[in-house]
Swiss-Prot record:
Cofactor notes: Binds 1 zinc ion.
InterPro entries: ATP-cone_dom, NrdR-like_N, RNR_NrdR-like
Phylogenetic lineage: Bacteria, Pseudomonadati, Pseudomonadota, Gammaproteobacteria, Lysobacterales
Chain segments annotated as transmembrane: none
Protein's recorded name: Transcriptional repressor NrdR
Domain of life, per lineage: Bacteria
Length: 177
């Protein structure tokens, strides 16, 4: 690999670390000529499906567009970078696991919305408002009401979960079980 500072073609690896998920290797490199150090990231490159756009056009999957979607939706939101990266990997994983050579862009959008819904509700509504072309406040209200009803159902399920856990002899969630 060439040096980012002096363009010399010989650099040596002085440290390598595998990410927690095992999908990325971070390498610390040093230039043989100028002595500058820099880091590189290696990721596995697997073929992703071609995206079929709404107008029928086709284009290669672009991870930068995916990143931009998450960044815009989560701008100024308290979501850790690590969680965003995990959500992006989940979208990419779903696309790979679909096993299709071509995937409609609507599938990508729905995957992004599913991940944003888990990450941050404000980010989810932001993305949904653009993706689904909200026309007025009523569209926002409807989406927020859907989220609220899902949260209510989730909260109602917690006592049921605790009862089941207790019936099988497992400590309750409140007791750190």
């Amino acid at each position: 690999m060439y040096c980012l500072f002096c363009q010399h073609t010989d650099t040596r690896v002085i440290d390598s670390r595998v990410s927690e998920d095992g999908a990325t290797i971070r390498r610390r490199r040093e230039c043989e000529a100028c002595g500058e150090r820099f880091s590189t990231l290696e990721t596995i490159e697997l073929k992703l499906p071609v995206i079929i756009k709404k107008d029928g056009g086709r284009e290669a999957f672009d991870g930068r567009k995916l990143r931009t979607s998450f960044d815009r939706a989560l701008q100024k939101r308290p979501v850790a970078e690590e969680r965003i990266e995990m959500a992006m990997r989940a979208v990419i994983h779903r696309l790979r696991m679909a096993g299709e050579r071509e995937v409609p862009s609507i599938v990508v959008g729905e995957c992004v919305m599913a991940e944003l819904r888990k990450l941050d509700h404000v980010g989810y509504v932001r993305f949904a408002s653009v993706y689904r072309s909200f026309q007025d406040v009523a569209d926002f209200r409807e989406e927020i009401e859907k989220l609220e009803s899902e949260l209510l159902v989730s909260r109602e399920q917690l006592p049921l979960l605790e009862a089941v856990m207790e019936s099988i002899g497992h400590p309750s969630i409140d007791q750190g079980g």
